[in-house]
């Protein structure tokens, strides 16, 4: 009698934490209920002008996509900063990151920082160090990843778990509010 062995096929997710100076990336693969760390790092743009920085982000993420072949991309949404110019610049970096994914016809999913932190740490207002620590533990890493890479990995983890946490809480809160009205 011959037994067949099937390799478990997971879904590979690229998480992106966009930034004009440093864009973090992290790749995880979800196989069943298990997460496997594939890689992470940062695309650093330097001090060049805006168009060159955006091109560096696009080219860097394009290379990562070609190398690691993710199937889905999870990107952190832009938060509204006190300085509107900073928010607009961050939005442009985010646009370059999303463009890299779209060029490869990948599905792009967006999560707020609160959603990501809630899903990974259990607290939507967690500090950077807490996110780094939980990412390290969840993925079995030997050391904490850099903050930007940790945020990107956290975004990928959030997506791998269906964006649970704040999304579920928000739905519950909406139904409570609608009952009160």
Curated annotation (Swiss-Prot):
Protein localization: Cytoplasm
Molecular functions per Gene Ontology: crossover junction DNA endonuclease activity; DNA binding; magnesium ion binding
Catalytic residues (positions): 17, 76, 148
Catalytic activity: Endonucleolytic cleavage at a junction such as a reciprocal single-stranded crossover between two homologous DNA duplexes (Holliday junction)
Single GO cellular component term: Holliday junction resolvase complex
SUPFAM superfamilies registered for this protein in UniProt: Ribonuclease H-like
Keywords from the named record: Cytoplasm, DNA damage, DNA recombination, DNA repair, DNA-binding, Endonuclease, Hydrolase, Magnesium, Metal-binding, Nuclease
Quaternary structure (record): Homodimer which binds Holliday junction (HJ) DNA. The HJ becomes 2-fold symmetrical on binding to RuvC with unstacked arms; it has a different conformation from HJ DNA in complex with RuvA. In the full resolvosome a probable DNA-RuvA(4)-RuvB(12)-RuvC(2) complex forms which resolves the HJ.
Protein name: Crossover junction endodeoxyribonuclease RuvC
Lineage: Bacteria, Pseudomonadati, Pseudomonadota, Betaproteobacteria, Nitrosomonadales
């Amino acid at each position: 009698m011959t037994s067949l062995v099937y390799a478990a096929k997971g879904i590979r997710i690229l998480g992106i934490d966009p930034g004009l100076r440093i864009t973090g990336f992290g790749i995880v693969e979800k196989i069943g209920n298990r997460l496997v760390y594939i890689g992470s790092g940062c695309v650093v743009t330097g001090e060049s002008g805006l168009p060159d920085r955006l091109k560096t982000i696009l080219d860097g993420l394009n290379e990562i996509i070609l190398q690691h072949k993710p199937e889905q991309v999870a990107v952190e949404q832009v938060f509204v900063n006190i300085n509107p110019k900073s928010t607009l610049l961050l939005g442009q970096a985010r646009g370059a990151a999303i463009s890299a994914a779209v060029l490869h016809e990948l599905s792009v999913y967006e999560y707020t920082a609160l959603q990501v932190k809630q899903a990974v740490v259990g607290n939507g207002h967690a500090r950077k160090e807490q996110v780094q620590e939980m990412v390290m533990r969840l993925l079995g890493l030997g050391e904490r990843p850099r903050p930007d890479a940790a945020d990107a990995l956290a975004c990928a983890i959030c997506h791998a778990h269906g964006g649970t946490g704040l999304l579920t809480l928000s739905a519950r809160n909406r139904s409570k509010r609608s009952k009160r009205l």
